[in-house]
């Protein structure tokens, strides 16, 4: 299991996450143990599709690893200031998702 987290900038994942995914190509020929992939995102924007492009970008990476699947995503919108995520409904969604991972 791998859980990636990224802020959404201009409706896309951060450059740091994109670089990590691009540099992970050494995993491709290996007998990797991860199967389920999760994506946690946050943004100032609060539209339901704000993280859509980041999800599609990650799905492109996942498609290269036939044993993997996107197991879940969590989006926290309207998160601008430090601490703004406190009490956000996405936290409970993330907790429940994490608790379901065995």
Regions found by a protein language model. Give the residues of each.
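Helix-loop-strand module that forms the ligand-binding subsite of alpha/beta enzymes
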Residues: 1-65
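Glycine-rich phosphate/pyrophosphate-binding loop and the adjoining helix
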Residues: 59-102
């Amino acid at each position: 299991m791998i859980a990636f987290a990224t802020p959404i900038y201009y409706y896309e994942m951060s450059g740091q996450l994109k670089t990590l995914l691009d540099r992970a190509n050494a995993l491709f020929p290996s007998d990797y143990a991860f199967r389920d992939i999760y994506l946690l995102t946050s943004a100032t924007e609060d539209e339901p599709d704000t993280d859509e492009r980041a999800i599609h970008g990650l799905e492109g990476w996942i498609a290269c690893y036939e044993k993997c699947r996107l197991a879940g995503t969590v989006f926290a919108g309207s998160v601008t200031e430090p601490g703004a995520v406190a009490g956000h409904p996405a936290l409970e969604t993330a907790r429940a998702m994490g608790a379901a991972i065995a």
